[in-house]
């Protein structure tokens, strides 16, 4: 049996498939080495041909049209936000989607309306039409720290002046299956909230302002308007971000266990605030737009009584070998000696976070790590680096003992890991279980040398590029060394 899910709306296009018991996934950005890349139906068909999938049953995430605002499925076409809900490998009675925008059926002359999220209690949907959280955070671009993003600022001005309609542009993009000259700056707009997530930690929150915004008739729009006419300092950025954390809690009833998805679900600071407020959000690495193909496929799997899958990997280039014990020991020595080391093993991860297959690794005890690693990554100075730690020892270092996908902030409990401790004392960490044997063994060897079972872990890519999906791409990154399978390459760029 061949089942296929397509996620081809606006950005982060992907294809997911079930082929005779095997699960396959490919993301356009990895194939074309263009971040958040959009690729249309022609590309998806070429992938299916490569996979030798013939006459499949196909479901797709899309923007539905019609008169019924509660409609989530039309044949095998799924509402975009409903595809987010369906992307979870587990079924939850309550599901909450917080995203930028989608369009869905509406009882008006256009038979469509824009909305920014979805709350589902059982089978009952409620659309969220409030001003989108990513747009609420947009005024951060006027802060001094983003002075280098002049092109992005002009883009936002065009949106505010209504000389650009993102919805109309997206419809044209899908119709023509071609990106245009606006694409590069649109990609930057997608990444702005993630960069703000790191910057806000340097500011002090004005809780009185947050309370005033929350108690206004239109909280999100009020917060946006008041900050968008100023040149916010880092304290206002922190205040704006804190507002976003709290407004999500205000918008939904307390939910102790729920499925959580959409682009905003990648925000580890907001996720932590939900946890601290008594919520239990269940987030998966593909909970963003890149996982909508998985949601569409899950819709078909449910119909055919096939169990949903949870161990998704990229269909990309893999090494011919696995690292031996000798190679793992050598890599650990390089890390202990403060070398910036690439780690390319198996298939790449699905989702925007590197989890030990496509990673750049470094010594977490080195207080100069950010400057050293940023010679390669070239990221803004305020953005933190994550960590990978042995799961059976994570409780010694972080207040969240199990967190396998870098989707929630933890408080750091140990002072000896400055490389992965953000200015606010937090870390986006990944816990590595013993069954992830190759990566776990590397952490074990690192521990023998630096007394900490941990590495700094950041994705194997350069600024503005997606995570590497070929060995050639990986070798082009100017690292001190890179381990690909069982081979170590040193000083390739000296």
Put a short name on every predicted segment:
Residues 30-41, 238:
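Active-site pocket-shaping loop/turn-to-helix segments
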């Amino acid at each position: 049996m061949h089942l296929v899910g397509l996620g081809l709306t606006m950005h982060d296009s992907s294809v997911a498939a079930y082929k005779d018991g095997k699960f396959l996934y490919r993301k356009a950005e990895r194939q074309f080495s263009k971040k958040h890349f959009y690729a249309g139906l022609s590309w998806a068909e070429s992938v299916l041909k490569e996979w030798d999938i013939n006459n499949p049953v196909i479901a797709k995430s899309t923007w539905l049209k019609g008169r019924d605002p509660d409609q989530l499925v039309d044949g095998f076409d799924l509402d975009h936000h409903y595809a987010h809900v369906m992307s979870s490998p587990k079924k939850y009675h309550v599901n909450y989607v917080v995203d930028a925008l989608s369009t869905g059926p509406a009882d008006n002359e256009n038979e469509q309306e824009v909305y920014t999220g979805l709350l589902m209690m059982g089978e009952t949907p409620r659309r969220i039409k409030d001003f989108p959280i990513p747009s609420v955070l947009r005024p951060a671009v006027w802060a001094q720290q983003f002075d280098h993003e002049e092109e992005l600022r002009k883009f936002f001005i065009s949106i505010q002046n209504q000389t650009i309609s993102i919805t109309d542009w997206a419809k044209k993009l899908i119709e023509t299956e071609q990106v245009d000259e606006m694409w590069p700056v649109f990609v930057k707009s997608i990444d702005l909230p993630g960069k703000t997530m790191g910057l806000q930690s340097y500011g002090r929150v004005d809780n009185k302002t947050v309370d005033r915004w929350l108690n206004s008739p239109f909280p999100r729009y009020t917060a946006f308007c008041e900050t968008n006419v100023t040149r916010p300092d880092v304290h206002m950025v922190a205040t704006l971000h804190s507002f976003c954390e709290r407004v999500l809690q205000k918008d939904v009833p307390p939910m102790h266990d729920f499925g959580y998805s959409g682009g905003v679900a990648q925000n580890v600071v907001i996720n932590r605030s939900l946890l601290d407020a008594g919520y239990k959000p269940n987030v998966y690495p593909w909970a963003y737009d890149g996982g909508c193909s998985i949601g569409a496929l899950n819709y078909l799997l449910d119909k055919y009584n096939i169990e949903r899958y949870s161990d998704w990997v990229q269909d990309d280039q893999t090494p011919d070998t696995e690292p031996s014990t000798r190679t793992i020991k050598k890599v650990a020595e390089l890390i202990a000696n403060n070398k910036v080391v690439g780690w390319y093993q198996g298939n790449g991860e699905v989702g925007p976070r590197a989890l030990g297959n496509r990673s750049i690794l470094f010594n977490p005890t080195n207080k100069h790590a950010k400057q050293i690693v940023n010679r390669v990554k070239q990221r803004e100075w305020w953005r933190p680096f994550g960590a990978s730690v042995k799961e059976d020892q994570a409780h010694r270092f972080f207040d969240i003992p199990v967190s396998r996908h870098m989707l929630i902030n933890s408080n750091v409990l140990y002072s000896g890991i400055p490389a992965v401790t953000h200015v606010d004392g937090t870390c986006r960490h990944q816990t590595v279980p013993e069954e992830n044997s190759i990566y776990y063994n590397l952490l074990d060897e690192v521990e023998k040398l630096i007394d900490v079972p941990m590495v700094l872990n950041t994705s194997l890519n350069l600024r503005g590029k997606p995570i590497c999906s070929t060995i050639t791409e990986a070798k082009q990154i100017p690292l001190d060394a890179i381990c690909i399978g069982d081979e170590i390459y040193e000083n390739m760029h000296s």
